[in-house]
């Protein structure tokens, strides 16, 4: 079991139970899944770029990424339905806890000019969305082999009912929010 998952079960969940005033430990919010996605506009002209992005996301997460395709055609962007556009991976269970631990302890401290995560990323149901501008903040990516820095969107889904519960959970897990 991952060290963050162990800490959640032994320390964080009982503390959140008291803080949020719930009667049962099963009502305490917990992580459900983490989704990483990368969308590339240059993949329309050169679909082979997606293979390098799949390799990078697979190295970061430890799980094979899936190539996503355009749902409908948009002529202004020279886009046809079915063209590969991006990469996505959904993490659950131990890989999710491992990624969350590495995100908090290794990746976010390496972001340039980092002053904390904004509070605007919550969706009203306790889930949090954030974006990273560079994939090189993760130690699994070799800086010399990167042809171009690309960003990614990270969605953290929780079982929280509202944003205050979700924020309390993520702060307890070590997410550095702005004051």
UniProtKB/Swiss-Prot annotation:
Gene Ontology annotations for the cellular component aspect, listed alphabetically: ribonucleoprotein complex; ribosome
Assembly and oligomerization: Part of the 50S ribosomal subunit; part of the 5S rRNA/L5/L18/L25 subcomplex. Contacts the 5S rRNA and the P site tRNA. Forms a bridge to the 30S subunit in the 70S ribosome.
Source organism of the structure: Bdellovibrio bacteriovorus (strain ATCC 15356 / DSM 50701 / NCIMB 9529 / HD100)
Name of the protein: Large ribosomal subunit protein uL5
Sections of the chain in a coiled coil: none
Gene field: rplE
GO BP term, pick one: translation
Family membership: Belongs to the universal ribosomal protein uL5 family.
Keyword entries, A-Z: Ribonucleoprotein, Ribosomal protein, RNA-binding, rRNA-binding, tRNA-binding
GO molecular function, one term: structural constituent of ribosome
UniProt cross-references to HAMAP family, sorted A to Z: Ribosomal_uL5_B
Gene3D superfamilies per UniProt: 3.30.1440.10
InterPro entries: Ribosomal_uL5 (IPR002132), Ribosomal_uL5_bac-type (IPR020930), Ribosomal_uL5_C (IPR031309), Ribosomal_uL5_CS (IPR020929), Ribosomal_uL5_dom_sf (IPR022803), Ribosomal_uL5_N (IPR031310)
Reported function: This is one of the proteins that bind and probably mediate the attachment of the 5S RNA into the large ribosomal subunit, where it forms part of the central protuberance. In the 70S ribosome it contacts protein S13 of the 30S subunit (bridge B1b), connecting the 2 subunits; this bridge is implicated in subunit movement. Contacts the P site tRNA; the 5S rRNA and some of its associated proteins might help stabilize positioning of ribosome-bound tRNAs.
A matching Pfam family: Ribosomal_L5_C
NCBIfam families, per the entry: PRK00010.1
